[in-house]
């Protein structure tokens, strides 16, 4: 790959990350370091902020999202293994949006409205025409065009498993479902995993770089994903093992590289289970 305008030595950084992911020694820890530039590396006109704009995740103004993407990396130096990248991200649980939830913009974030009222009537389908999915694809196309020779594309924050089901069902309702309809929960998790990879594969085919590498929080020389279960802080190790571990076993086996977002001290009881996953 020719040098990126925003990271001329990106090939050296990717070589180090390849060594790091494969257990090699790069002489130090991997470092994702950015530092502000005194002047932007290039001048890109700024569109005026739309009225009522509250979050960079918003889908209320496509052109403004494109402009934010174009300007996202121009004010930074990228050092260590950090790489300039943008994502067609709509919030921390894009999969829930693709599967039927609605997003409500908040101050610096987006909230997801539950969409499963009657569990037995749930339809788990891939909807090519879903508004949020189409917004993601349109934004990714523009980011790819703008980023050519300048920056990489990262995956949006898809999320999976119990966190996605909680966003769609409502957290308190799902906690009750674990006790009252565990078979429905298990079936739903299987369907969510299958649909996750419909979206993941479509995104990877679009955003992978010429090495086949992909980016989420860091770069990896293949199919990378971040997994998580913030919901796990509210359940016992036995429930985590019964409901979430099968999800994580399958998902970590279906990507080349994975990382886990471990959310706070409430999730510590699941330490041994997570360490038992050979692919994580």
Residue ranges and their predicted role:
Residues 63:
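Ligand-binding grooves and catalytic loops that recognize ribose/phosphate and carbohydrate rings
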């Amino acid at each position: 790959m020719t040098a990126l305008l925003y990271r001329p030595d990106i090939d050296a950084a990717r070589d180090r990350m390849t060594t790091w992911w494969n257990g090699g020694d790069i002489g130090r820890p991997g470092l994702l370091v950015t530092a502000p530039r005194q002047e932007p590396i290039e001048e890109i006109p700024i569109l005026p902020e739309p009225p009522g704009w509250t979050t960079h995740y918003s889908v209320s103004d496509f052109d403004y999202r494109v402009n934010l993407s174009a300007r996202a990396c121009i004010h930074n130096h990228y050092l260590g293994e950090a790489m300039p990248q943008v994502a067609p991200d709509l919030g921390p649980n894009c999969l829930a949006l693709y599967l039927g939830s609605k997003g409500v913009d908040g101050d610096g974030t987006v909230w997801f409205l539950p969409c499963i009222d009657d569990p037995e009537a749930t339809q788990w389908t891939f909807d090519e025409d879903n508004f949020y999915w189409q917004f993601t694809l349109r934004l990714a196309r523009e980011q790819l065009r703008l980023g050519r020779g300048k920056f990489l594309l990262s995956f949006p924050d898809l999320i999976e498993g119990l966190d996605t089901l909680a966003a769609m069902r409502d957290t308190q309702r799902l906690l009750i479902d674990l006790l009252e309809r565990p078979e429905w929960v298990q079936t739903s998790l299987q369907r969510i995993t299958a649909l996750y990879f419909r979206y993941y594969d479509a995104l990877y085919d679009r955003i992978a770089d010429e090495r086949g590498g992909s980016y989420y929080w860091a770069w990896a020389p293949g199919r990378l994903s971040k997994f998580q279960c913030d919901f796990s802080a509210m359940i016992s190790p036995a429930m985590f093992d019964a409901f979430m571990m099968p999800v994580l076993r399958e998902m970590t086996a279906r990507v080349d590289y994975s990382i886990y977002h471990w959310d706070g001290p409430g999730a510590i009881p699941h330490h041994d289970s997570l360490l038992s996953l050979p692919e994580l």
